[in-house]
Amino acid sequence: MKSNIKLMFAAGMMLLATGCTDLDVPLKSQYPSYPNSEVALNAQLNSIYSHFRGTLGRRFFEAMSLSSDEQTAVSYSGGWIDGGAYSHPSLHDFSYEDNTIDWMGELGKGCVKANEVINSDVDAKYKMPARAMRAYFEFLMMDCWGEAPILDVTVEDNDMNKRQPRAIVAKYLEKELLEIIPHLSTDASEGRNSIPNKYMAQALLAKLYINWPVYMAASVDKYDASSATNEKLDACISICDDIINSGKFNLGSMAYRFKFGPNNSALNVEDFIYAMPYDTYTATGMQYGRANSYKDIKSMNPSYFGMKLSNSGGGYMTMTPEFA
């Protein structure tokens, strides 16, 4: 037995002595730049397209619905006060700590992701949709906050604190959208799956133009709708005509309630120009129903969604009579 142990030990030492000693092996698990294969680039683009999904599914909805008087905050039994995060938008008395408006940084991160593609040496067909997404993120910052940073530089130079006047950002967006629109896809189905196409960029430009006098005003309190003139109105109408005349969209192809039902992804809804898809497994985050659900919905079996839910709804927002 002792002889066997000695032989095994000697054999092990010989293996160590003759083993690989050249450790200068190129590392292929680390890349100084993003891989440029089509699969890798599409994955990178998809991360840009879906970047805003989580915020869009809750905080963006809360900020828009509560501040526009469509809905108002409620606090049944003293719950869901959350420091006034839901009541402040309705009262137009925001605090920088409110979660309902604390997502400007997410838009900045989306611009950074887009810049990684835009500033690389990839083909222009990948850069154009990335520029469209960057314009979308920039538009939301400008539309919601007024002054906003123009994040069109390298990652190192992006600074969320270097804000530009709203009018300058609006003119930058106009120039950017006019440049990329001719080079984007005309496949309408792409827009319904969060992939930016020509019609998404055109619709974004139309939104920019229809509110042009507001964006050009020195400040919102200096804007007077009764006396303002819109130099971009004809251009806005022309863009809308182009979208309509494409024949790829139809407002009356199905009942309104089906367009926003749980199975609408299979219906090819023809009036959706640009949409963010959600599901319960790979694309989660849609919480629109939660805010308006019965607070103790988990006690219902089945609930009005057709199944028993393990958690209760939020029940912290209610629709105002004017919108009901």
Predicted regions: what they are:
Residues 129, 149, 272-276:
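Structural recognition of the beta-strand scaffold that forms the well-ordered cores
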Residues 40, 45, 49, 82-101, ...:
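Elongated scaffold/linker segments in the mid-to-C-terminal portions of large proteins
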Residues 147-167, 215-238:
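Short coil/linker segments at helix-helix boundaries
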Residues 120, 141, 212-219:
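Glycine-centered coil turns and helix-coil junctions that link the paired helices
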Residues 20-68, 96, 230, 259:
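Membrane-proximal, proline-rich intrinsically disordered regions
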Residues 42-53, 78-148, 158-171, 175-191:
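Conserved, well-structured interaction surfaces
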Residues 1-29:
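Bacterial Sec-dependent N-terminal signal peptides
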